[in-house]
């Protein structure tokens, strides 16, 4: 049968209107040759054993994630055995395009989209230099954080701020990164800014403002390195604080308020304020309206000594067949490598500032991390499995 002229709009939408490929309903792969070319443009060569092994690892990881994290409360949904056991990724691509068998098409496409996300759910720099990254970021704060038994403070002396908690988060799990990316409209590894997270908890909201001021005045963070569009403040009303500070200073100038009481009066007022409304365009739609914090993303210039080249040279030195021509050629190549080359790069970290009340809310109720992750999971289920869930309910 002669095929009529058509345009593969589903494949072109990500290029023409910015729609995420995750939201495309299907692929347009017509043959194994097409699948080979598609994978090659993706960065994988099916003829290379290492590439096939990496794809198989991603496939297995993706199926485990779907079944463990998305389907545990959907017993009516089961990945068809034919799709679940197929190890040839090219066939999954073909099935993702073939509408002749709708159920197979839907599940093959679900699996490949999750494979795509897992291929983005890691950071090369975090995996290779994660310990050094955290140490250098923590190193910016360590000289300013003081602990005396149960008491913690940011700085010492008159400008210090009492803290109830200070911590730096450990490495983000790949499944957590995948879930985060799957709910984003723009799903890509470069969109994860919180591989490293720093949190400071103050006793009241006014001290949260003082923490921001301290970080700036002591260059603990550089405001030039704060990422535009990655700041979210739902903790303190800056405009209202500015107006009230002007009012209090005018009262002091008029002799109606002692100068030494200006800040204490401002503290009292700030702590009585209602929480500000969240921005209309929040970069995290899963954040609860009950969650209040100051958050921003800052870049840290990381400097590490890469010892891999030195290890390569030492390996060749220990080989018992150093006279072999091939080994000699490889050793000559290793000699041209800098044994202790320096690596420098920018790496993001997210800083959160909360008051004690907001911190306690974040550990229970609507603002808790567990509830936040569940909202995220439900959005991902709808995005990937919405049609299958609705069909199963019919």
What are these regions (language model features)?
Residues 150-158:
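Acidic, Ser/Thr- and Gly/Pro-rich intrinsically disordered linkers and low-complexity segments
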């Amino acid at each position: 049968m002669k095929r009529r002229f058509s345009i593969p709009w589903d494949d072109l939408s990500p290029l023409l209107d910015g729609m995420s490929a995750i939201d495309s309903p299907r692929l347009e792969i017509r043959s194994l040759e097409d699948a080979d070319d598609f994978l090659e443009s993706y960065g994988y060569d099916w003829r290379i054993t290492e590439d096939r092994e990496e794809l198989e690892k991603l496939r297995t990881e993706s199926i485990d994630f779907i079944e463990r994290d998305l389907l545990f409360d959907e017993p009516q949904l089961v990945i068809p055995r034919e799709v679940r056991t197929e190890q040839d990724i090219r066939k999954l691509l073909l099935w993702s395009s073939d509408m002749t068998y709708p159920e197979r098409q839907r599940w093959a496409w679900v699996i490949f989209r999750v494979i795509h996300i897992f291929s983005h759910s890691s950071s090369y720099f975090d995996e290779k230099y994660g310990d050094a990254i955290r140490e250098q970021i923590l190193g910016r704060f360590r000289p300013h954080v003081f602990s005396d038994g149960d008491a913690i403070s940011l700085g010492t002396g008159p400008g210090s701020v009492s803290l109830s908690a200070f911590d730096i988060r450990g490495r983000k799990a790949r499944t957590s990164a995948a879930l985060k990316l799957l709910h984003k409209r723009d799903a890509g590894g470069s969109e994860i800014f919180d591989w490293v997270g720093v949190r400071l908890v103050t006793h009241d909201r006014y001290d949260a403002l003082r923490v921001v001021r301290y970080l700036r005045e002591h260059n603990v963070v550089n405001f030039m390195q704060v990422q535009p569009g990655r700041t979210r403040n739902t903790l303190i009303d800056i405009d209202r604080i500015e107006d009230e500070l002007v009012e209090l200073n005018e009262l002091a100038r008029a002799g109606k308020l002692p100068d030494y009481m200006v800040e204490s009066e401002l503290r009292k007022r700030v702590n009585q304020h209602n929480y500000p409304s969240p921005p209309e365009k929040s970069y995290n739609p899963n954040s609860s309206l009950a969650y209040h914090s100051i958050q921003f993303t800052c870049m840290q210039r990381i400097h590490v000594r890469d010892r891999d080249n030195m290890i390569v040279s030492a390996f060749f030195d220990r080989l018992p067949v150093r006279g072999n021509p091939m080994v000699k050629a490889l050793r000559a190549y290793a000699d041209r490598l800098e044994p202790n080359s320096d690596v420098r790069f920018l790496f993001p970290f997210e800083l959160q500032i909360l008051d004690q009340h907001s911190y306690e809310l974040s550990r229970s109720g609507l603002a808790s991390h567990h509830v936040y992750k569940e909202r995220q999971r439900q959005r991902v289920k709808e995005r990937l499995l919405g049609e299958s869930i609705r069909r199963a309910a019919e």
